[in-house]
Amino acid sequence: MPNAIVAAEQYREIFLNQHPIMDVRAPIEFTRGAFPNSTNLPLMLDSEREKVGTCYKQSGQQAAIALGHSLVNGPIKQQRIEAWTSYVKANPNAYLYCFRGGLRSQLTQQWLKEAGVEVPYIQGGYKAMRQYLIGVIEAAPIQQPLLSLSGMTGCGKTDFLLQRKEAVDLEGIANHRGSSFGKNIDPQPTQINFENQLAIALLQHQTSGVACLLLEDESFLIGRSALPQTFYNAMQAANVLVLEESDDARLERLRNEYVHKMYSGFCERLGPEAGFAAFSDYLLQSLVSIRKRLGGKQHQELQDLMQQALDQQINQNDTSLHLVWINLLLHKYYDPMYLYQLDKKSERVLFKGSHQAMHEWLDSYQTR
């Protein structure tokens, strides 16, 4: 029976259906970049892979293969086969891959076959699948018209996007809310993983049958996640929708996001005392990150107000003073910057309105 190979034509189906994949690359390769539906069960550990790589450079392929067999042998080999078979037992429809769909994939498949387990390996491996996803991102602006959702900080763009089937949530994929205070408790994905997850989200969106692709009007960087250049350029040329919200609602939303949610998250992760310390550091360091743009005097004023709010919060369990520095930050920093940016794209604005009005406009857009 010939070895079972999953052809490149099936990449789309693998990603859309979140097909379970056994990634037999070394842990260091997996950490740099992987797919959401993959599990790292390496043929060789990092140190073993490094030795084999050095041997390959010095003595050629056959010597490297022989060294690999000597390093992964006996009980070590048996442990790896047992880990693979356990995964396949839990995921009977699993596929496997290595970096290029070469020797590591073939050897893993052979050892599994000898253990009585048949697992297809993916043609081209991780590298070819990654290239496929890069192509998905580059082609996305051609597949559907783009609409860019803009609006002042705190107007609820993310909340709005999460209610729309036309939307892909870039900030959710980047695990960052896009502003200077947009850091979340959990770290952002690696750049490669951000791109992989973005491509899969775009693939899923393209099967949803909607008339457009709705994205938040983002900077090139979302935290430290960089939008692919071609995709970002298309976003910069897209027509714009402007979401409007009252100042009071914006203040309350930002207090909830910057203060209540972050404080609760840190305390849940670290406990009350360490949680409050980490929360305070998050706020103060976020302010430091925009010190140059604020200017020293304005930064000091905001820092003093922020510290007063933190003191009131810890001593009186009252977060009302946070509204003072948030209000100043909006009107002295975020709003002027937003209005300047909006003025440059005013000719591309299709519609401005409240959450309800925007929902109605988009509903009618779908039927045009």
Curated annotation (Swiss-Prot):
Residues 15-138 form the Rhodanese domain. SUPFAM superfamilies: Rhodanese/Cell cycle control phosphatase (SSF52821). Its EC number is 2.9.1.3. The keyword tRNA-binding does not apply. This is tRNA 2-selenouridine synthase. The active site is at 98 (s-selanylcysteine intermediate). It is an enzyme of class 2 (transferase). GO terms for biological process: tRNA wobble uridine modification. PANTHER family: TRNA 2-SELENOURIDINE SYNTHASE (PTHR30401:SF0). Keywords: Selenium, Transferase. Involved in the post-transcriptional modification of the uridine at the wobble position (U34) of tRNA(Lys), tRNA(Glu) and tRNA(Gln). Catalyzes the conversion of 2-thiouridine (S2U-RNA) to 2-selenouridine (Se2U-RNA). Acts in a two-step process involving geranylation of 2-thiouridine (S2U) to S-geranyl-2-thiouridine (geS2U) and subsequent selenation of the latter derivative to 2-selenouridine (Se2U) in the tRNA chain. It comes from Shewanella baltica (strain OS185). Monomer. The lineage of its organism: Bacteria, Pseudomonadati, Pseudomonadota, Gammaproteobacteria, Alteromonadales. It catalyses: 5-methylaminomethyl-2-thiouridine(34) in tRNA + selenophosphate + (2E)-geranyl diphosphate + H2O + H(+) = 5-methylaminomethyl-2-selenouridine(34) in tRNA + (2E)-thiogeraniol + phosphate + diphosphate; 5-methylaminomethyl-2-thiouridine(34) in tRNA + (2E)-geranyl diphosphate = 5-methylaminomethyl-S-(2E)-geranyl-thiouridine(34) in tRNA + diphosphate; 5-methylaminomethyl-S-(2E)-geranyl-thiouridine(34) in tRNA + selenophosphate + H(+) = 5-methylaminomethyl-2-(Se-phospho)selenouridine(34) in tRNA + (2E)-thiogeraniol; 5-methylaminomethyl-2-(Se-phospho)selenouridine(34) in tRNA + H2O = 5-methylaminomethyl-2-selenouridine(34) in tRNA + phosphate. One of its GO terms (molecular function) is transferase activity, transferring alkyl or aryl (other than methyl) groups.
